[in-house]
Amino acid sequence: MKERILVTGGTGYIGSHTVVELQNSGYDVVIVDNLSNSSADVVDNIEKVSGIRPAFEKLDCLDLEGMDKLFTKYPGIKGIIHFAASKAVGESVQKPLLYYRNNLVSLINLLELMPKHGVEGIIFSSSCTVYGQPDVLPVTEEAPIKKAESPYGNTKQINEEIIRDTVASGSPINAIMLRYFNPIGAHPTALIGELPNEIGRAHV
C-alpha cells in the first residue's frame, strides 16, 4: 500500500512540483490549499504531468476543525510537507497581523493534530530570510540567525522555534526545516510553474 503524504499549499509553485515528484516516486498525495494565490486548475495540470490525480481539498490550514476532519477522511497520513503560507515580504510589512495569523496558526494547528492522527513527520518550508543580512557570502547552513528584516521573515524564525520547542517537549514528531532561496523556472512541460492569481487574471 502506498504511503500517504499531505502537502499543504500543494497547488502553489513549489508545492505542485513537489506533488509531481512524490507521485512519480510512488506516494499517495493529498493536497490542501485555500487557493488564495493559486488555482484549482493546477490539480488538472498535475494529473497531466504525472498521470495521477492527487486528492485535493480546498481548505484553509487555519480551520482547525476542518483540518481535523481531513485527517479523519484520509487516514494513514505518514508525513506533512507544509508549504502553505503568506509569502510576500513587502506585503508582510503592510499587513503584519495577516502574516502572523496565517503563518503561525497554520503550523500550530498541524502540530497539534499530528499526534492525534498518528502523523509521524513534518517538513517545514522555512526561508533564507531567517539569516537576515549575512556577514559572509555565500550563506551556509551554519550561518547565524539574524534579526528578521520583515514580518514574513520573523514568522519563519518563530515557526522554526515553535517546531524546536514542540520536538523538545517530547512530542512524537520528527521535523525537517528547509531554508531555501527564491526558486525560479517551470516544469519542462510548462504545465506547472509560477503563476500567481493576480498575474493570471491580468492575462485573461
Where do the PLM segments sit?
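Short beta-strand segments
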Residues: 31-32, 58, 124-126, 176-179
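Conserved small/polar residues in nucleotide/adenosyl-binding loops
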Residues: 202-204
